[in-house]
Amino acid sequence: RLSESVVTRTKIAKGQAMSRGVMKIKENNLDMLIDFGVPAAHKITFGDWSNPEYDIFGDIMKAVKMLKDEGKIPSRMLTSDTQIQRMRKNKGIQSAIYGNINAGRLVTMNELRSIIMEEFGLQIATCDERYAYIKADGSRVNGRYFDEDKVTFYTADVSGRAGTGLWGPTPEEAEY
């Protein structure tokens, strides 16, 4: 059970780092915020992607351009299935794929992946995994590793990873 909790905590940390740029720890008598130094300019607040009329392509274009202007070439877009479904129902994306003849037709995942790759050079990845935890009052609740309404653009290695997780003894443990 303890090892499962450690693995879950690392997944929570990764999800928070990718979706927020910070990691919040408020458990086991700790209350701390670890800031990974994501520049404020990179924390873009997009418009309402739940509105089928909203210009989602414009948001993606703005984020990709900002990164490219800084010499960074994003290769992945990480988000939730909720945001993916909003993209599939978006009229601008539907028109880009089907033209105006099939307006309102739901975009398939293959079509969405294809147009996002073609237009922006991005592979789509999703994270909808959840974990359960017990609150201080004893109630059991579920949390998400990656925030549902977020979209993260990043550069991944060939395997799709961003960064490396290191496991090993702490300096204190190494003294033994």
Indicate where each model-derived feature is located.
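Intrinsically disordered or highly flexible coil/loop and linker segments, enriched in small
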Residues: 8-15, 72-73
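Short, glycine/acidic-rich hinge or "gate" loops at secondary-structure transitions
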Residues: 12-28
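Extended, solvent-exposed, turn-rich assembly/linker loops in the middle of proteins
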Residues: 31-111
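Sequence/fold signature of self-assembling virion shell proteins
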Residues: 94, 99-176
